[in-house]
């Protein structure tokens, strides 16, 4: 689950996974140094597109059925919201929403549901009939569009299921009662409806062995309860997760053992993937989709394939995305171009490994009020990745200094199996030789072309180019005029501190924080590179960089901290802050 607000809930949901990922990161950092087109049309606002009424026939074989579900989409932050469907900022789901999803090429939807706020917490754990009927209505809308639907128990996982180790009998009784009611309500629905036992299951006060036992018990009990309700549930596809839906090898091995013990051909494995954690949240200097991040992705998908797919067990990647991108409520924490590379590569890895993927959308991709994609170019990249590769480049920007002679700039192309066809500005093709040159995988914009493209060299984006390839989505390149940013002295408090910043066309990539002795300062004391958004955040319109209360809570009183701000142009700017009680002073000298 990767959500838009509330962010506090995001941290609570991810705490177990972040801990395990952090340990892996610390191990990695001990040995690896830090490194720093044609669009798909969006539907018109408020208008449901025409959708074919053709209803797909579900293949008998589970592998073929799950393959037919590709691609998939999550109705996130809706029926899973707490306490009610609209509590987290999305409007109520409508039939028009599913019409849109179907028209945009999706073949299945995952409908997360949190039941606890609409259910008695004591026996017989009755689910409110009105809430159950509302879920049925939403499911039926999706089914009517010919979509496959995955229905689950969602945030209940950390509300009460997580207490199973210390309150075993009551948790299991409530879990079984919950699934008995759900399964009975939906037992006559078509086979295009799948049940998922529980989202991202976690267990408090238990060691790893006990956690594995508890999840095995839950998944096994889920299987028994659903099958015993009869009707379509006798052969319905059932989706079983690993602990926290994490795709680590030992956790997938545990799940494979559970599935083997059930002797049921109608089972589906599910995990989630939000990339290499430091890249996903922009911490520890992982600002780019670099070799380490790429390797994490390819290794993860290979594990899914080897553990399940190669053995005839289908995998449904129930959620994927990045933990901090996109989020329309604040500045991008991950660079858009680097995120585009991530989504392009993920589509490729899913295809070659036979994994069906479900985009986690809490409202930051599709605006559910207008039924339009918030970033059509981002969705175009995702949609293209379902069927083909796209070329990219080392950067989505070329930075040109404000003053002085303009010099040629070079980017490295990443064709990804395609062939580079040239550079365009709108409908105008640039001329190879005079505007740009190509040498191997290097494309160089000439000084004369950049002089023309930057015009009067006003700060910011002066021109947008496209690198076009033989297939896939063109790669956009922004030509940007900049100067090294200027930061000014400031005073404030630990609860409110913003240093004045003249960004001068540049954009912030990351921030380092160190004490005078060279040791790390800030919340992430295992790295000098602090987490974007958690420790600091730029305000381009307000011409400031904010240092958060969380940052100052972790800073030693009276100890000067040297901040190094890294910008996407390659420029770095040093700044100094000192906390004295609740007061903070900042200086650029």
Language model segments and positions:
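Secretory targeting and sorting signals
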Residues: 1-43
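Active-site region of glycoside hydrolase catalytic domains
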Residues: 173-286, 291-293, 303-323, 353
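Aromatic-rich peripheral "rim/lid" segments of glycoside hydrolase catalytic domains that contact
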Residues: 328-428, 434, 440-444, 454-476, ...
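An active-site-proximal structural segment forming one wall of the substrate-binding cleft
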Residues: 89-108, 124-153, 161-194, 214-230
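Extracellular/luminal ectodomains and secreted, surface-exposed scaffolds of diverse proteins
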Residues: 429-446, 530-541
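N-terminal carbohydrate-binding accessory modules
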Residues: 38-110
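Edge beta-strands of extracellular beta-sandwich domains
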Residues: 472-483, 571-588
